[in-house]
Amino acid sequence: MASLIEKLLRTGDKKTLRQLRNYADSINALESSFQTFTDAELREETDRLRERHQDGEKLDDLLPEAFAAVREASSRTLGMRHFDVQLMGGAALHLGNIAEMKTGEGKTLVATAPAYLNALTGNGVHVITVNDYLAEYQSDLMGRVYRFLGLTSGCILSNQDPAVRREQYAADITYGTNNEFGFDYLRDNMAWDKSELVQRGHHFAIVDEVDSILIDEARTPLIISGPAQGDTNRWYSEFAKVVTRLKPDEDYEVDEKKRTVGVLEGGIEKVEDYLGIHNLYESANTPLIGFLNNAIKAKELFKRDKDYVILDGEVLIVDEHTGRILAGRRYNEGMHQAIEAKEGVEIKAENQTLATVTLQNYFRMYNKLSGMTGTAETEAAEFMSTYKLGVVAIPTNRDMQRIDQPDLVYKNEAVKFDAVVKDIAERHEKGQPVLVGTTSVEKSEYLSRLLAKEGIRHEVLNAKNHAREAAIVAQAGRKGAVTVATNMAGRGTDIMLGGNAEFTAVAELAAKGLDPEENSEEYEAAWPAAFEAAKQAVKDEHEEVLELGGLYVLGTERHESRRIDNQLRGRSGRQGDPGESRFYLSLTDDLMRLFNSGAAERLMNSSVPDDVALESKLVSRAIASAQGQVEGRNAEQRKNVLKYDDVLNRQREAIYGDRRRILEGDDLHEKVQFFLEDTITALIDAATSEGTGDDWDFNQLWTNLKTLYPVSVTSHDVIDEAGGKSRITVDFLKEEILSDARLVYQAREQAIGSESMRELERRVVLSVIGRKWQEHLYEMDYLKEGIGLRAMAQRDPLVEYQREGFIMFQAMMEAIREESVGFLFNLEVEVTPAEDVVVADGAGEHTEHHEPQIHAAGLEAPEKPAQLQYTAPGEDGASQTRVEGRSSGRSGNPAKAAQDGARKPAPKKKKR
């Protein structure tokens, strides 16, 4: 049924393809006339198209001419002419779809035409890639096309300072990773001044490897966190003791597969008895549930000397794939502290969420979203339901000739790898290039040792050094090449039979000291000859490898996602080349062991010898079933993350919208008057909720009012004015006190000046919003941590989260209003008045207006925490954390890396 829904949701039907084909025909009809343009005339086409758009013409109508201009510019600068299917893919992107294009169809070039067309609006286009290396490489290469047409391109890289980032965002087209774009959005919404903002809106995004970014990585939200306030360490120690008294299956359940725990009724009673509390589910006790869950996870799911080690009294995480210690990394959401408490070492400060957003909600902010991938069909339903994105299957430029062989299944892993090595050796001996895909670094290194023992030269790629690995992958199609790679390694780089001419030419020019940005004219002059020489160099070898059967792709294990299996296969058979693929499996592979142990066990007990491969429908069905289970679980996880973030997203949009308007200079006078009215009304309502004037405690009410503002009218004055307590009404009381508060506010404004008062209002409200929002995020984190247990009380956790989250948000907004009013009345303020200053310079004298300067305790920009943690999905979708100042790596010059096999720090990018 799911596949039927997926087919129905795919928009790549005859009608859509006919529309795209018509666009391609229109562009082709213009090609000969565009070829007659001089370089200057082609550049002027950009100005003409921009003016026509400003005069009201729609981008859809400008598409044929814009795409024709890009095709011609690309031919002249890169020596690459867009195929018709690449133009169709570009049109699909412009229309806000996902273009499903097979590996090797030139997706990087596809993005140039829609990026150029949409950049004509002046609003900026974002092109999102999976890592820094690809962002920089594509920006450098495709930036040559944009510059030729008079546009600028930028690139966002980790560790760039805000001034550089702002410059890159100001470009017409900006490249970068999903994490960098997302973190910039969050940092902009933590800014204290308009000058700190770097982004300029979310208009049009093209997401490369869209299934990886919008599906695989969407399970992990982006989080910026800093040291938490208050003492929570006591609770970690307390709960570490509590859980030693609890027994698995009796007091709690553990699911190792999902890495989750659930507390049973008996366990809850023991915890309540130990802590001396009546009900763990009461809202006041909500934070305790998170401590309990983490303590059980630390006890059952995190094993010493496997998941972590203790060195010098410190808990250090061990990489599950490499066995290496990950210095500086800490588990988030209190997990690291729970392990420290369990081990009895010093508990280091917990981090508090300062800003967070899911990738789903970040990308849904774009006015228009599009994407490219070779494998979107299996997720078409999710793309439509989450992002309202249709999937358009673009035909290949040439017919596919790859042969996909049936899987070979062995009883155990050792025998499987023996067969793998034998197959590689046979192919290598005759010179056929081989690409071997593994699911982990550990398996890559194991296979590497086996190959070395047999004397087979090979390269191992583990997605650690993107620049160096792209250089190796680019040459993985050469005769006799053997390349072992994890699924994530070397993405975005074409494996061309005989070698990658484009990559060779880039490396050649870099070796001569030429840079496409720094030496633009020399570079463009040298490119045609370098590219032609590189093409000639690989031509003969290309023919030889074709004769040998093309690239052979060998998978050593099925991945938990069908898409990633298909991506690996797709590395072979590009652009109509011959190719072959096969998967070698064992019944002890993780996928079979965890998700279809029954089928695996039946086959294990069969009489087939260990070293004989099994080929059976039962195996195929077991694999399909296991992959279906994992995909279903992951989809449910993403859906769950999104449901909960949708609750927070509505609140985030409201708060971030207010912050942005304040930063941009909104006049808050009316809003502050509403704050004043609302706060005083709430105080009076609370004091007069029962009885009549004779029953009300006027002394207490006046005490409360004095904490808010310097009241100038006494309770006796108001009572006398009303004609006694018995005759006073709530409305009269509100009218009198509000009138007094407004007079006091006016007097304060006269004392410091209207302009200064407006600035004070902005600074106070911004400061209070910032502090209260962080407190709110902290409370929402704790609410979410314990909300799952509401299911035991027969309540829907999501509904409970929505309900309590709304109540907490209302309470936060009330606190923002009350604190803002209190500060505005009571802050001691020093004001340097506004003044007009005459300035003399070379052009003569002119007058500059200097805004009033306000100084008050607590109103300066808050001090930035010494360390900020950035948590985001890695390329495998798993959560990874880096501490600011120690980046997870920054890409280097790709061609230089190709030349010397090492990545160097990238220079600061310039707007171009």
From Swiss-Prot:
HAMAP family named in the record: SecA
Lineage, highest ranks first: Bacteria, Bacillati, Actinomycetota, Actinomycetes, Micrococcales
Catalytically driven reaction(s): ATP + H2O + cellular proteinSide 1 = ADP + phosphate + cellular proteinSide 2
Reported function: Part of the Sec protein translocase complex. Interacts with the SecYEG preprotein conducting channel. Has a central role in coupling the hydrolysis of ATP to the transfer of proteins into and across the cell membrane, serving as an ATP-driven molecular motor driving the stepwise translocation of polypeptide chains across the membrane.
Annotated localization: Cell membrane; Cytoplasm
Protein family membership: Belongs to the SecA family.
Region (Disordered) residue spans: 860-912
GO terms (BP aspect): intracellular protein transmembrane transport; protein import; protein targeting; protein transport by the Sec complex
Molecular-function annotations in GO: ATP binding; protein-exporting ATPase activity
Protein name listed in UniProt: Protein translocase subunit SecA
